[in-house]
Amino acid sequence: MKLTKVALFSLGLFGFSSMALAHGDHMHNHDTKMDTMSKDMMSMEKIVVPVQQLDPQNGNKDVGTVEITESAYGLVFTPKLHDLAHGLHGFHIHEKPSCEPKEKDGKLVAGLGAGGHWDPKQTQKHGYPWSDDAHMGDLPALFVMHDGSATTPVLAPRLKKLAEVKGHSLMIHAGGDNHSDHPAPLGGGGPRMACGVIK
């Protein structure tokens, strides 16, 4: 009789231990899933920048958005743009959070309120997106297809966090960008064609 009671007691302890272990495994799996979900949520964070084609005389026109996201390799800028001129265009972060026109030499200049290329290190040099001695705002050129759309993402390897670019503006210039100040300054790009404030 005593043996039976001892056996039953042992079985009860074993069952309770098994349940506790199973519960522990469940909680561990739950915590792991929560950690994974948190990481996924972080990776889903983004800034959506509304972009307008600049036309001080007739009014600006909405041409889509650029989404900025974090990646292991730097910030990714994904355009969802339309109605732009075909070809390569200079693509930069400018210092001020404005796309307003301003006067220069008695003429109204589109997007001049954005200031110059974002250059927190005061390099005063235009260069490649990965150059340590160039504007932080220098991005890869933006490619616009024949139908006027731009959807190809570009990577800014020196920029890591979304917070870095908030409070500035995103500028698209007419014409390409040779990522140099020679033979023309600031990559030889043309007028400020489209702009969006990064909030």
Swiss-Prot record:
Entry EC no(s): 1.15.1.1
Keyword Acyltransferase: no
UniProt: Cu cation binding residues: 92, 94, 117, 173
Required cofactor(s): Cu cation; Zn(2+)
Gene3D superfamilies: Superoxide dismutase, copper/zinc binding domain (2.60.40.200)
Chief location bin: periplasm
Subcellular location: Periplasm
Residues the record lists as binding Zn(2+): 117, 126, 135, 138
EC class of the enzyme, as a word: oxidoreductase
Molecular functions per Gene Ontology: copper ion binding; superoxide dismutase activity
Annotated signal sequence range: 1-22
Reaction equations catalysed: 2 superoxide + 2 H(+) = H2O2 + O2
Pfam family, one: Sod_Cu
InterPro entries listed in its UniProt record: SOD-like_Cu/Zn_dom_sf (IPR036423), SOD_Cu/Zn_/chaperone (IPR024134), SOD_Cu/Zn_BS (IPR018152), SOD_Cu_Zn_dom (IPR001424)
Keywords: Antioxidant, Copper, Disulfide bond, Metal-binding, Oxidoreductase, Periplasm, Signal, Zinc
GO CC terms of this entry: periplasmic space
Cofactor annotation comment: Binds 1 copper ion per subunit. Binds 1 zinc ion per subunit.
Family, as annotated: Belongs to the Cu-Zn superoxide dismutase family.
Subunit structure: Homodimer.
Free-text function comment from the UniProt entry: Destroys radicals which are normally produced within the cells and which are toxic to biological systems. May play a role in the interactive biology of organisms with their hosts and so contribute to their capacity to cause disease.
Protein name: Superoxide dismutase [Cu-Zn]
Native source species: Haemophilus ducreyi (strain 35000HP / ATCC 700724)
